[in-house]
Amino acid sequence: MIRKPFKIMIAAALAGTALTACGPVKTGAAALVGNDRITIAKLNSTVDKWSKELPKYPGAQQIAQQAQAQGQQVPFDPSSPQRSALYQLVDMLVWDEVGRADGVSVSGGQVDAIIAQNGGLSTIDANVLAQGLPTEYSRDYVKSVVLRQELMRKYGVTTAQDQQSQQQALQQVAGMYQRAGRRLKLDVNPRYGSFDFQHMALGPVCPTLSKPDSGTPTTSGGVSCQA
């Protein structure tokens, strides 16, 4: 089953940091990621397609529930499909930049192979819907998953002989993710929260998040709203 098996490990490797992305976003944009502008209109259209497709895949909700029961972090936010979709779109773009900067790429053949190994496109579609995106992003999602797996393999996360070596490798990849976010000048519209690099998720939506001091770092490295 296609999942993001290294997300929790990378979040742990980033513990203690409080790097967030939230700044002045141009009118009409949900997020700016380098030269990519995710408009609010595009985000709403994406969520609309997702909501129409979801009932056709009963297994999608089951996949999300099983992942949560197993203690895995699933970025799907039932209270805000827009935040779920925006997170996925931003996350894929950041990983693309990590791969580009490190010379790691994924071919169409690799994507096809993973789809075949995981039960075909219908299974992948259900997994993608469980993550909050419509099926038109299925191949992009698989490509992103394979890309991060290639990076983990390259830096020894999956081949480490001991926990210390694995942690060091994770921290190296986590640092690459942070630097990619900085290079891209990742900027999220405050109405959707701020991007929390420690947890690799969108942080809370703060009523006054547009103010520089409204997102406050917590002792765990995340971000909370001021009272």
Residue ranges and their predicted role:
Residues M1-F76, A174-A227:
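Short, low-structural-confidence N-terminal segments
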Residues T17-A21, V98, E150, K154:
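Hydrophobic membrane-targeting alpha-helices
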Residues V25-T135:
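N-terminal targeting/tethering segments
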Residues S45, K49-K52, G109, A113-Q117, ...:
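Charged/polar, solvent-exposed surface patches and flexible loops
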Residues D125-T159, G203-A227:
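Proteostasis/folding factors centered on peptidyl-prolyl cis-trans isomerases
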Residues T135-Y137, K154, T158-V188:
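Acidic/polar surface patches and capping/hinge elements
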